[in-house]
Amino acid sequence: MRLFLSLLVVVLSIVLEGPTPAQGVPDVSNSFDVLEGFGKTLEDNVREFINLITQSELPAKTRDWFSETFRKVKEKLKINS
């Protein structure tokens, strides 16, 4: 009898509480919007970085330095041979 009464109290409390609002249900479209925004931001940052590298003098100077060093090594090897 005591078990029956305690179960009845639990069931009544659940029924009287009513349906709970869906608070933690993630919205899939919102997740995709956030992911799309992140992708666009990343794309813009990468494009800006690549443009910065291609417009700077560093690649040209590096290429010239390697060419000059390679030419000097070739000349030294020719002289020694």
From Swiss-Prot:
| Any one GO biological process | triglyceride metabolic process
Q: Does the keyword Transit peptide apply?
A: no
Instruction: Write the signal peptide boundaries.
Output: 1-24
Which Pfam family would be a valid example here?
ApoC-I
Write down the superkingdom of origin. Eukaryota
Instruction: Respond yes or no to whether keyword Nucleus is given for this record.
Output: no
Keywords on record:
Lipid transport, Secreted, Signal, Transport
Where is this gene product found? Secreted
What name does this protein carry?
Apolipoprotein C-I, acidic form
Gene Ontology molecular function: any one: phospholipase inhibitor activity
The gene behind this protein is APOC1A
Gene Ontology CC annotation, any one: high-density lipoprotein particle
Q: Extra notes?
A: Apolipoprotein C-I is present in acidic (APOC1A) and basic (APOC1B) forms in P.paniscus, P.abelii and P.troglodytes and perhaps also in baboons and macaques. The two genes for ApoC-I arose through a duplication process that occurred after the divergence of New World monkeys from the human lineage. In human, the acidic form has become a pseudogene sometime between the divergence of bonobos and chimpanzees from the human lineage and the appearance of the Denisovans. Pseudogenization resulted when the codon for the penultimate amino acid in the signal sequence was changed to a stop codon.
What is stated as this protein's family in its record? Belongs to the apolipoprotein C1 family.
